[in-house]
């Protein structure tokens, strides 16, 4: 690749979170892109595609601890970050692709409806820019950094190889591996039906008001696991087309999606051989 790509990075865990730093490390190691960060100045998990409609937001250039081309912190949601980046900061020189994450925790199944990580990627696609949302199942400490550099580069090149706007957004989940287990390849899947259901937990009651925590949740799974969930359980990295309608099967037949899966496998194998 003669000319380096222009890559915009964001997340919902905050600009100085471990996950986005790991993503920067991998991209620097691959050395095929100039990196720009526009991310929230505080954690914005669960923001989905919300944006600051009723109040102003600020953006401030910050010193970042890794050699990126520039980094800005935003006092708003992940979608605010994308709106400011594409609508002002880089309006005259748009990025080739937006990468969001790496999120601390899974964003598989219907959880993507809540995810600020996925929300930022969807905002990019809606705005005409290819995007990938990355999440690490369970905890960011499970991420296998030594094995991820070429995988992330391949996924970026795959997303850029797709004709816009057909399936140019993707939601990637890395499985959690234990006891020296390794990732067992990548698989293109449809977004699963599983979701995390939380029961409100009462914190206190002062007689006038009750205070609750809504962060207690667990993944609910049917006996008939989705392909996405089954792939993660068998330690495969899942790559799900990221659409506002949430499922590629609403736009194509099952046979057409199976053909897309085969094309994805062929692309990955050709990149590994090259």
Swiss-Prot record:
InterPro entries: SurE, SurE-like_Pase/nucleotidase, SurE-like_sf. One of its GO terms (cellular component) is cytoplasm. It is found in: Cytoplasm. It catalyses: a ribonucleoside 5'-phosphate + H2O = a ribonucleoside + phosphate. Binds 1 divalent metal cation per subunit. Its cofactor is a divalent metal cation. It comes from the Bacteria. GO terms for molecular function: 3'-nucleotidase activity; 5'-nucleotidase activity; exopolyphosphatase activity; metal ion binding; nucleotide binding. Its EC number is 3.1.3.5. It is an enzyme of class 3 (hydrolase). Its main location: cytoplasm. Nucleotidase that shows phosphatase activity on nucleoside 5'-monophosphates. HAMAP family: SurE. This is 5'-nucleotidase SurE.
């Amino acid at each position: 690749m003669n000319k380096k790509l222009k890559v915009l990075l964001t997340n919902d865990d905050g600009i100085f979170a471990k996950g986005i730093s790991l993503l920067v490390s991998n991209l620097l190691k691959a050395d095929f892109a100039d990196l720009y960060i526009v991310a929230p100045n505080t954690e914005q998990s669960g923001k989905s595609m919300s944006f600051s409609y009723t109040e102003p937001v600020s953006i401030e250039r910050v010193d970042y601890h890794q050699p990126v081309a520039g980094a800005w912190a935003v006092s708003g949601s992940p979608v605010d970050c994308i709106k400011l980046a594409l609508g002002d900061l880089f309006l005259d020189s748009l990025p080739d692709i937006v990468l969001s994450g790496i999120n601390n925790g899974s964003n598989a199944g219907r959880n993507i409806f809540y995810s600020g990580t996925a929300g930022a990627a969807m905002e990019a696609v809606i705005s005409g820019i290819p995007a990938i949302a990355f999440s690490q199942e369970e905890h960011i400490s499970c991420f296998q950094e030594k094995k991820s550099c070429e995988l992330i580069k391949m996924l970026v090149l795959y997303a850029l190889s797709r004709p816009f706007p057909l399936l140019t957004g993707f939601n990637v989940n890395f499985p959690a591996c234990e006891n020296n287990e390794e990732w067992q390849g990548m698989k293109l899947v449809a977004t699963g039906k599983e979701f995390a259901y939380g029961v409100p937990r009462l914190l206190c009651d002062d007689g006038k008001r009750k205070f609750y925590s809504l962060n207690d949740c667990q993944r609910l799974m049917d006996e008939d696991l989705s392909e996405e969930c089954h792939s993660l359980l068998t330690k495969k990295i899942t790559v799900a087309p990221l659409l506002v309608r949430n499922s590629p099967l609403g736009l194509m037949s099952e046979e057409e999606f199976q053909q897309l899966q085969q094309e994805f496998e062929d692309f990955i194998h050709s990149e590994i051989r090259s």
